[in-house]
Amino acid sequence: METVLKALRPTLRLAKLEGDAAFVFAPTEKIDASMLLDTIEGCYFAFRRRLQNIRQATTCMCNACVLIPNLNLKFFAHHGAFVRQRIAGREELAGTDVILVHRLMKNSVAEATRLQAYALFTASCVAAMRIDPSALEMREHQETYEHIGEVAMWIHDLEARWKHELEHRRVLIEVNDTETVLETMLPAPPPVVWEYMTDPAKRMQWQVGTDRVDQANPAGGRRGTGTTNHCVHGPGAIVEEILDWRPFEYFTIRATVPGLGPTTYTIFFTTEGAGTHLQFRLKKLKNREQRDLWTGGAREQWLGGLGRWFERLAELLTAEMAAREPEPPVPVSRHSAPSHGH
């Protein structure tokens, strides 16, 4: 549970622990489709890596440890209204939609699909996310609940996403292929910094001098590998293409920069205390004309601009974190292995 909660937060806020399940939520205006999908998949990937580590580190043959390979996670996502109320001194979420998201846990998905690891999204959640579920290879599903009726849903296969994660070729700038490095500390955890650096609306808040960021996503409407951005600065524009996308860890972009031409860079996100160590690596410039431009003034202009942007970003993140409600502490497991996953 500790691994799961750490991966879900701070994108999602813990409402309550319910046995071996965690009830989490986020206001609609605080999260978009890409962040929700990246957070869910990232949580599942962290869970699978944790299971691998436990299997490799233990020789215990007790029943709990023997059953570790059978553990899995399921996610249930719904979009709706809720009210906050205090019950026995504790704040809880209530309402018809809160009841529905709990009812989703009783379903026939395993029987219908044989999937053991999945994320289940109601049709209302998919509509709010503004994605094309078919293009994202989700499966249509339907359940009927007493006093609620038929509920249309979409199933996202997390086992397939894990397989893709393991097989997908990484594209990143290695240290020995780096032209220059820019590093800074930002006062927020990686998921928050990631959102500010990848959401076009949030980029406009700190990229001073940018008139607009036009984003085109691959089929399905989700940010990731293949996404292109047109960052318009007066008469010029920087055209970006995402080559690799590892949420909250790093992304790699090929960009065409006015006055410099095509460049490739990777930005790494590393947790340090309550903040994020950000490292920008620019790929070596091997074109002679580009190198002349770089040493002739483009380097100072480019890195100076990035430095000013990151200063503004730090100001925004400081205000963002100060405005957030304090998170309850993550419970620390007393055992080396989780008991269940839902």
Positions of predicted regions on the chain:
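Hydrophobic ligand-binding cavity/cleft-lining segments
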Residues: 167-218, 335-342
